[in-house]
């Protein structure tokens, strides 16, 4: 099954990711609240923008999170790793219920406003391959590094 879900901490109706057109490869993600992204200072953690969404992927798939092409020019928002990779075992993550976040650096000198319902970026489902003698058998025990940064 490949599907988006609302995370448990969200009680209100939120917009789940959706494709804008029939030929869109990515699903648009939306901010669940108004936030202000402060200007980046060297050494700052990236600013986390909540989506309120988790994703279930099929085996040998991941969801790639990418920035909107207009964000760097219009809002001066860049993603620190260029992309985000959401593995199948991140679903139901005990640290945050598998909620996905978009991480940004604001490279302007002024705070940037993101409004509730505004498009943040896109998620693109991707297949991946494994080597023939792959022996990975571990399980995800915790979330990723940013579970410590949720308070921005």
Which role does the model predict for each range below?
Residues 1-152:
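DUTPase catalytic domain/fold
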């Amino acid at each position: 099954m490949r599907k988006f879900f609302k995370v448990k901490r969200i009680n209100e109706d939120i917009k789940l990711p959706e494709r804008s057109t029939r030929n869109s490869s990515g699903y648009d993600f939306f901010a669940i609240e108004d936030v202000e992204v402060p200007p980046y200072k060297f050494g700052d953690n990236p600013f986390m923008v909540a989506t309120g969404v988790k994703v279930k992927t099929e085996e040998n798939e991941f969801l790639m999170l990418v920035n909107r092409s207009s964000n760097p020019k219009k809002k001066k928002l860049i993603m620190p790793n260029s992309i985000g990779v959401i593995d199948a075992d991140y679903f139901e993550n005990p640290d945050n219920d598998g909620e996905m976040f978009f991480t940004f650096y604001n490279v302007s000198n002024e705070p940037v406003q993101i409004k509730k319902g505004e498009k943040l970026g896109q998620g693109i489902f991707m297949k991946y391959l494994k080597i023939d003698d792959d022996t990975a058998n571990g399980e995800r025990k915790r979330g990723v590094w940013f579970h410590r940064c949720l308070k921005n």
